Amino acid sequence: MSMTVTTSSNVSDAAMLSRLALQIKSWGKALGFAQIGICDTDLTAEEAKLQTWLDKGFHGEMAYMETHGMMRARPHELHSGTVRVISARMDYLPPEAGFATNLASPNMGYISRYAGGRDYHKLIRARLKKLGDQINSELVALGFDAADFRPFVDSAPVLERPLAEKAGIGWTGKHSLILNHDAGSWFFLGELLINLPLPVDIPVQEGCHSCVACITSCPTGAIVEPYTVDARRCISYLTIELQGAIPEEFRPLMGNRIYGCDDCQLVCPVNRAAPLTQESDFHIRPKLKQPELLTLFTWSETEFLKQTEGSAIRRIGHQRWLRNIAVALGNAPSSADIISALEQRKAQADVDEMVKEHIDWALAQQRAGDLQTNNRKTERLVRVIQKGLPRDA
């Protein structure tokens, strides 16, 4: 339902909307969002970029990126009547992140820090719903009809990063993530699509300048040019989105990263002063904090489902979990214990052929016995973290 004015003139309506926009930002912070921004729905400039990216096949097996076509760049088609997008930022950097400790320990599994706690999708969507309800309560109290709104997170076909940039949340870094001068890139985004003509915010100035740290540090060279990521090369894609076999050329480069990758964020100088999350739900679960690869590899499917309940990790399923860990074990220092664990897991009936192929690769790597426990990029990354992010090292 569109907003219907019952008492105010257009001038007073504009003033009311300005006041409401300020209230929305205040309500958002009370709900746990670190920042709220507002923008219009025009993403025309992004359509050509999206189509080029898709045409080059950079989305890999993420067919859903292509299925929804340009709807991603047209919020008003995603939710009819939408004239504004309220973009919300929620910080997730956990305390005692232990980045360097984890990456420097090849017998431990590295899990991207966004996934160490509770799955953010339901949490953020619920908070956005509360924000929409507060907006409508205020509108009704002022004598207006309730607005029509719909909350989204990144599981929906919406270009959240360009919207966040338009809404003044930050600028697009060369790694394609949104960067904020105060918060770096350690945050989730959510959107509230609404048919309320609120005043929009001003985008911030780009701040990367000549820095290319993210590009040069990517383990697999996935940032093929500034602002462009070939997902097919990205460790996050390979360990989370890819359903089949991980190409052999990338396996040695993955190191101990078993779910996602944070390297491009860890070297970014904008992240040096990033705040810790205020959400305890995003703190790393004890059994996912500096976890031993051999321990994780013994988890049955039942144990996997139990330990990942309410976590984003659960979506990859037990077989891909084993696939990723097998690769990490193949990259670990040669060990009789690892070889034994790989052989035992391969012999189990619940292991599919895809996982067995990765186990065979890992066994060959282990038996070669001349592995480098850390490649040069990882060693350099650890030094960068220790120097630039001492609190989180």
Curated annotation (Swiss-Prot):
Residues 196-228 form the 4Fe-4S ferredoxin-type domain. Gene3D superfamilies: 3.30.70.20. Monomer. [4Fe-4S] cluster 2 binds at residues 218, 234, 261, 264. Belongs to the QueG family. This is Epoxyqueuosine reductase. The keyword Metal-binding applies. One of its GO terms (biological process) is queuosine biosynthetic process. The lineage of its organism: Bacteria, Pseudomonadati, Pseudomonadota, Gammaproteobacteria, Alteromonadales. It is found in: Cytoplasm. Signal peptide: none annotated.
